[in-house]
């Protein structure tokens, strides 16, 4: 299998990389749909069960951003960041289950997520501040330093694509390799602590991606606060 983990979906449709990632992404979306459906089917004033879990998740996402950009802005951008966090979290979790592969272990998938964040926060920055003012901010506080600061800022922003995508990809890909070696070397009972560790890493990576997205958006829409 060329060093790849066995996957049930791969056994159905072949072990090509495109099929593996696409089929598991569709599975992720299906799981999220089921979760959302279960949580919103019978909404109650006092939440219970899956509604309680989903409301806690939404509240956690808002609290995460409130410290960075204030609660009002955090609520405004919660749908995007909450969606990204949920997709990344579920993707990471199905990768922990033997027989499935995390879409986030593919660089093309994580690069797509990073590009969504990059394009969106720059769009918000231009919309909020204007095209000229937004890029003028890249030149720094002193005009004499503009020829130096502008290319540095451009490179810094472009590097965020690499940072977001490769951090997530590297962590989850490493988890997959760790899981493969673990299952090859020891019986099924002994790897249980490893599964808990991989679960913790998956949650952590979803958190990091979400908080960085909040930080990047805050930096693009709150430039006037940085100047004071």
Curated annotation (Swiss-Prot):
Q: Does the keyword Ion transport apply?
A: yes
Q: Which GO terms describe its cellular component?
A: plasma membrane; proton-transporting ATP synthase complex
Location in or out of the cell: Cell inner membrane
**GO-annotated biological processes:** proton motive force-driven plasma membrane ATP synthesis
Please give the name of this protein: ATP synthase subunit a
Q: Which organism encodes this protein?
A: Aliarcobacter butzleri (strain RM4018)
Q: Name one GO molecular function term.
A: proton-transporting ATP synthase activity, rotational mechanism
InterPro entries, sorted: ATP_syn_F0_a_bact/chloroplast, ATP_synth_F0_asu, F0_ATP_A_sf
Which keywords belong to this entry?
Answer: ATP synthesis, Cell inner membrane, Cell membrane, CF(0), Hydrogen ion transport, Ion transport, Membrane, Transmembrane, Transmembrane helix, Transport
Q: Where are the bilayer-spanning segments?
A: 16-36, 45-65, 80-100, 106-126, 138-158, 178-198, 201-221
- In which broad location class does this protein mainly occur, judging by the first location in its UniProt entry? membrane
Q: Which family does it belong to?
A: Belongs to the ATPase A chain family.
- Gene3D superfamilies, alphabetized: ATP synthase, F0 complex, subunit A (1.20.120.220)
Identify the coding gene.
Answer: atpB
* SUBUNIT field: F-type ATPases have 2 components, CF(1) - the catalytic core - and CF(0) - the membrane proton channel. CF(1) has five subunits: alpha(3), beta(3), gamma(1), delta(1), epsilon(1). CF(0) has three main subunits: a(1), b(2) and c(9-12). The alpha and beta chains form an alternating ring which encloses part of the gamma chain. CF(1) is attached to CF(0) by a central stalk formed by the gamma and epsilon chains, while a peripheral stalk is formed by the delta and b chains.
Purpose of the protein = Key component of the proton channel; it plays a direct role in the translocation of protons across the membrane.
Topology relative to the membrane, per the entry? Answer: Multi-pass membrane protein
């Amino acid at each position: 299998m060329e060093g790849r983990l066995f996957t049930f979906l791969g056994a159905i449709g072949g072990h090509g990389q495109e099929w593996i990632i696409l089929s598991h992404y569709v599975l992720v979306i299906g799981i999220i749909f089921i979760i959302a459906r279960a949580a919103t089917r019978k909404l109650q004033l006092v939440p219970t069960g899956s509604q309680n879990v989903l409301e806690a998740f939404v509240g956690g996402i808002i609290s995460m951003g409130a410290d960075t950009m204030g609660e009002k802005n955090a609520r405004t951008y919660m749908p995007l960041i909450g969606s990204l966090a949920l997709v990344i979290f579920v993707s990471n979790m199905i990768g922990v289950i033997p027989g499935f592969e995390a879409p986030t272990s593919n660089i093309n998938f994580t690069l797509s997520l990073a590009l969504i964040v990059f394009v969106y926060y720059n769009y918000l920055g231009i919309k909020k501040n204007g095209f000229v003012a937004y890029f003028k901010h890249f030149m720094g506080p002193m005009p004499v330093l503009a020829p130096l600061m502008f290319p540095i800022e451009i490179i810094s922003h472009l590097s965020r694509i690499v940072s977001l995508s490769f951090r997530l990809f590297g962590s989850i890909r490493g988890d997959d390799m760790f899981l493969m070696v673990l299952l090859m070397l020891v019986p099924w009972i002994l790897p249980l602590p490893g599964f808990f560790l991989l679960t913790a890493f998956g949650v952590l990576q979803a958190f990091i991606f979400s908080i960085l997205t909040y930080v990047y958006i805050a930096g693009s829409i709150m430039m006037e606060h940085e100047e004071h």
